[in-house]
């Protein structure tokens, strides 16, 4: 799956844990993970990859489960995430909700999304992605025989 965010101004890269985080709720259950989010991406990064971490025991604690490749341009960031690392199955649709947060040093307090950093969407809202009506070809992993590269 690909996630892409654009910014109004040029991105200024930072090496801290709060730079351009992506929060994912992949099981559709608001009672699992931290405040419903099962994963946080990009708390750490290398030149080519960002971390994928699972929230542990519903707390602001993390367990690294893998990495995602990323690409950065002047005012955009794209993450290429394997569905199998975030609870999905290759070839099957995965519906989820997601939220981008930049420099939102929330430290486990979801209410701080309202006052710290930039978030999209704002406050406690999240974007919803529903792939339930897509065919197997449209939900395959990038680079596979049936993958279109447009997941």
Predicted regions and their residues:
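Accessible peptide chain termini
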Residues: 1, 150-151
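Short, well-ordered beta-strand segments enriched in hydrophobic/aromatic residues
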Residues: 1-9, 77-83
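Acidic/polar low-complexity flexible segments
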Residues: 19-47, 74, 85-149
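Trp/Tyr-centric glycan-recognition "aromatic platform" motifs on solvent-exposed beta-strand/loop surfaces
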Residues: 42-59
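Divalent cation-coordinating acidic motifs and surrounding scaffolds
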Residues: 62
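Beta-strand-rich interaction surfaces with strong enrichment in secreted/lumenal proteins
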Residues: 65-70
